[in-house]
C-alpha cells in the first residue's frame, strides 16, 4: 500500500481448501525493496537501515481478518498502538491475571505444571472471529 505497509493474504490448502486469512502489517522503518518468490510464495522485504532511519530495531504491527484486506487494516487501526516492550509487558500482566484466577492446592509441582499448562492451552485462543466493524 505504501513504503511502510504491506497487505495480503495466506491461502491455506490444508483442512479447508479455500481458507484465506487476510493481513495488514505496518513497519517502523521504510521498505526500500521487495521481492515475491513465486515458487515459495514468500515476500522478501529490505528495510531502510541508514542512520536517518527511525531505529535499528524494526517493529511490525500486524492484524488479521477473515473478511478481506480492508478488514485487516481496519482491525489494525482500531487497536491500541504499543511498542513491542509495552505490548509484551501488558500481555504478561493479562496472562498472570487470567492464570491466577484458578489455584490448586495439595498438588505436586509436576501436577501444577500439567494443570496450568492445560489451563493456558484452553485460554490461548479465545478468538472473536469477526472484524472490528462486525463483518
Language-model-detected regions and their locations in the chain:
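Acidic/polar, glycine-enriched structural segments that form the non-catalytic walls/loops
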Residues: 1-135
Amino acid at each position: 500500500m505504501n513504503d511502510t505497509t504491506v497487505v495480503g493474504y495466506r491461502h491455506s490448502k490444508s483442512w479447508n481448501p479455500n481458507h484465506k486469512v487476510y493481513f495488514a502489517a505496518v513497519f517502523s522503518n521504510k521498505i526500500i525493496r521487495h521481492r515475491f518468490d513465486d515458487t515459495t510464495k514468500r515476500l522478501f522485504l529490505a528495510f531502510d537501515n541508514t542512520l536517518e532511519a527511525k531505529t535499528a530495531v524494526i517493529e511490525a504491527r500486524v492484524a488479521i481478518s477473515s473478511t478481506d484486506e480492508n478488514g485487516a487494516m481496519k482491525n489494525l487501526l482500531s487497536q491500541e498502538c504499543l511498542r513491542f516492550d509495552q505490548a509484551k509487558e501488558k500481555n504478561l500482566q493479562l496472562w498472570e491475571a487470567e492464570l491466577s484466577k484458578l489455584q490448586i492446592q495439595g498438588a505436586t509441582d509436576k501436577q501444577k505444571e500439567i494443570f496450568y499448562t492445560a489451563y493456558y492451552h484452553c485460554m490461548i485462543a479465545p478468538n472473536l472471529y469477526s472484524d472490528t466493524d462486525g463483518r
